[in-house]
Amino acid sequence: MTAALALSIAPEVAQAEALRERVQVLESRPGVREVLLVTEAPKRAPSERHVVLVLGGGGGGFAVVSRDGLPEVYGGLSPDQRQRLADTVGGVVIALSPPSDRPIMDREWRLSSAHVCDMRRAVDWARAQWPCSSAWVLGINNGALSAAVATASIDDLAGAVLLSCVDEALDQPQKSERMRVLAVRHCNGAGTSPNASGGCARRTLVSVHDERRVPSALEAGNALHAPRFNGKEQQVVDVVARWILTGAAPDEIR
């Protein structure tokens, strides 16, 4: 597993031509750096823009794979998924790496104040770059716990998207009542958390029905770095984008 993106980059900002993504490096805490992969859609009116910060599963690192001889970076979402989401919401998708002092993030770390500090630094940077945009966090698998912790700790967020999340992520409170939360889970694994609805009208649950499609070798190789919805990943991305824009989502994806 690649815990961080292996690129030779300047401390402040660089352009990764081969990956066709903008790379930003931030100092999140004294002496600690984190890498951001920035995917931006064509410009729209400022009031229509959204920034989505993606927090990966597994240990939280980036996976670098080769397709047709060109490197691709899976930072929670695949490059195609990041671009599709950015284009649909008319904004920016930012994949966040683990911090340099914690290349593999476990549950204890994801609940820590230092992790919140790292996420807050990324949110603050994004808000400074796109001040008229709404900021969201999207977490995948273990990253969903990070996203939920972010909404419990960082006030300057519009809400969170939790993909393939465990009940512990759903149980996290939100810092502000205005925040919205979308949880997308497998139908056969989406147990009901006592606080899954919690009487919160701004929390939306979507079930993905599992038709037991056998994953390809490429999908299996990236299982820890991207959401696994058995061939319905594109539908999930579209549902997420629609929910960010409108607040509406279907009860299920088949």
List the model feature ranges, each with a label.
Residues 202-254:
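C-terminal catalytic histidine-bearing segment of alpha/beta-hydrolase fold enzymes
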Residues 158-213:
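The feature captures the conserved acid-bearing segment of alpha/beta-hydrolase catalytic domains
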Residues 82-103:
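Conserved alpha/beta-hydrolase
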Residues 121-178:
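Primarily recognizes the serine-hydrolase "nucleophile elbow" in alpha/beta-hydrolase
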Residues 1-8:
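Bacterial N-terminal signal peptides
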Residues 14-47:
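N-terminal cap/lid segment of alpha/beta-hydrolase-fold proteins
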Residues 44-84, 88:
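Short, surface-exposed "cap/lid" segments of acyl-processing enzymes
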Residues 77, 105-130:
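Alpha/beta-hydrolase active-site loop
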